[in-house]
Amino acid sequence: MAGIQDLKGKTAVVTGGGSGIGKGMCRRFAHQGMNVVVADIEGEAAEKVAIALRTEGARAIALACDVSQRSDIESLAAASIDEFGAVDVACNNAGIFFGGKLREFTEGDWEWTMSVNLMGVVHGSTIFGKHMAERGSGQIVNTASIGGWAPDPNCAPYTTSKFAVVGFSEALRRDLEPDGVGVTILCPGPVATGMAKADRLRPASAGSSNATSLAAEPVMAVGMPPDDVGDLVIDGIRENATYVFTHPDFGAAFEPRFDEMRRALARTPKPRTGDVRPEDLS
């Protein structure tokens, strides 16, 4: 299935659009002549981005949105469609990160991470996916991570959420392809963003934490420019690419995992079939 070749006049919704990778995508989409909906839990940040885009001549609106709340995504979709008539590209990009030893993470850390990084993607994909399937076209871009393929130490909740985003998005791609809707999985490496400062957004329901979000700050500070990620995403949309990676050198980090899988498969005997006992099926 081909991707969306001509983006001019199309509409993109970007969660986490007030900063970082989301902001970079918003800017690059606007430069392509797209209408842009900048969605962010920090409404003021989203508005600043939208104002800057409008100053450059783009059609852009800002909407406050907590992606962990399905009702917020439903409202986001409704407002976007009311404003621009349809949504052609939905980027489920909002995410949080903090690091620490496994024993340091609280139940609140896990629940908050999953509610944003995974369920935010699920909410956006199912709501915008339904809209696109009914129209017979569209592209969903879900932000995972290099960490969704090659886990780093000291960030178990984040890694778990991003592995889940990869698996969910691969399944979603197969589900939506017959409806003419593409799904692309964005897997960034280090990008110059403020995601490592997620603690400022921590809800009261998540309680206090012994972990810290500051561990990744030095890496983020020397990361790839967010606008460059936006350009790669546009290429991925046009190709209906399954994956978009930002750092090709990181491919070497995948090999130990793949090697372990190949060794495990090679030493595994073929399963027996037949000889099924009725009690095995009870």
Regions found by a protein language model. Name each.
Residues R103, A150-A156:
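Active-site loop immediately N-terminal to the catalytic Tyr-X3-Lys motif
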